[in-house]
């Protein structure tokens, strides 16, 4: 079956993408690793000893980045409804973190600690209908914010991918109510044509 023009364009862009080549060379599972690396270079969210949760972690490139930085004294917990191949130094839980059994398993692993950081690069399966996709995207963002509210220590940080649209301002307002400072980040590895940006909440109240 012949590929569509948009499919061919995506394939050509993928083949020519410097971040795809860098990911292959550096051993990362996806180009998204460089988004987190760039943000972390600027904001120093992940350090040796950091305890964090990676929501929507599959295929695992953000968990790879985090595990390499936190070292033996830190801890990375990864959660996703999809399976993920093991990442050294990462505790992975497969399941929906809204479900009681999944949360219970996570909290047992957490063992009474509070998180320094929650990161979320979650995105829904896109339907191609922008209104539906935006609603699904912000539902994931809201769930991630609730998770951060419940598990971050005072002073902890939250990094989340959002897509700009009608729900953006209310979501930004909700983040500002929970954090001392909220800033936007658009890393170079984020494609120019994408409406995605990252919101970073610093200093959980």
UniProtKB/Swiss-Prot annotation:
Binding of S-adenosyl-L-methionine, residues: 60, 62, 80, 96, 121
- The chain's disulfide connectivity reads none
Q: Which coarse location class applies to the principal site listed for this UniProt protein?
A: cytoplasm
**Reactions this protein catalyses:** uridine(2552) in 23S rRNA + S-adenosyl-L-methionine = 2'-O-methyluridine(2552) in 23S rRNA + S-adenosyl-L-homocysteine + H(+)
UniProt-listed Enzyme Commission number(s): 2.1.1.166
Q: According to its record, what are the GO cellular component terms?
A: cytoplasm
**Cellular compartment(s):** Cytoplasm
Which keywords does the record carry?
Cytoplasm, Methyltransferase, rRNA processing, S-adenosyl-L-methionine, Transferase
Q: Give the InterPro entries listed for this entry.
A: RNA_methyltr_RlmE (IPR050082), RNA_MeTrfase_FtsJ_dom (IPR002877), rRNA-MeTfrase_E (IPR015507), SAM-dependent_MTases_sf (IPR029063)
Q: Which GO terms describe its molecular function?
A: rRNA (uridine-2'-O-)-methyltransferase activity
Q: What class of enzyme is it?
A: transferase
Can you tell which superkingdom this protein's organism belongs to?
A: Bacteria
Which Pfam families does the record associate with it? Answer: FtsJ
Q: Where is the active site?
A: 161
Role summary: Specifically methylates the uridine in position 2552 of 23S rRNA at the 2'-O position of the ribose in the fully assembled 50S ribosomal subunit.
Q: Which HAMAP family match?
A: RNA_methyltr_E (MF_01547)
The entry sums up its family as follows: Belongs to the class I-like SAM-binding methyltransferase superfamily. RNA methyltransferase RlmE family.
Record-linked PANTHER family = RIBOSOMAL RNA METHYLTRANSFERASE (PTHR10920), RRNA METHYLTRANSFERASE 2, MITOCHONDRIAL (PTHR10920:SF18)
| UniProt protein name | Ribosomal RNA large subunit methyltransferase E
Q: Which organism is it from?
A: Chromobacterium violaceum (strain ATCC 12472 / DSM 30191 / JCM 1249 / CCUG 213 / NBRC 12614 / NCIMB 9131 / NCTC 9757 / MK)
């Amino acid at each position: 079956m012949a590929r569509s023009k948009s499919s061919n364009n995506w394939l050509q862009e993928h083949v020519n993408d410097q971040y795809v080549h860098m990911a292959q060379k550096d051993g990362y599972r996806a180009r998204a690793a460089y988004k987190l690396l760039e943000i972390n270079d600027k904001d120093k969210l992940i350090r040796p000893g950091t305890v964090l949760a990676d929501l929507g972690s599959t295929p695992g490139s953000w968990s790879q980045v985090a595990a390499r930085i936190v070292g033996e004294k830190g801890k990375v917990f990864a959660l996703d409804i999809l399976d993920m191949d093991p990442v050294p130094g990462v505790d992975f839980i497969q399941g929906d973190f809204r479900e009681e059994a999944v949360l219970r398993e996570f909290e047992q692993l957490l063992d009474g600690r509070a998180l320094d950081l929650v990161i979320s690069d979650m995105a829904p399966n896109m339907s191609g209908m922008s209104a539906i996709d935006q609603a699904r995207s912000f539902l994931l963002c809201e769930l991630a914010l609730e998770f951060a509210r419940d598990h971050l220590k005072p002073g902890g940080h939250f990094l989340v991918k959002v897509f700009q649209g009608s729900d953006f301002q209310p979501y930004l307002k909700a983040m500002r109510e929970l954090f001392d400072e909220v800033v936007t980040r658009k890393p170079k590895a984020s494609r120019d044509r994408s409406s995605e940006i990252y919101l970073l909440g610093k200093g959980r109240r």
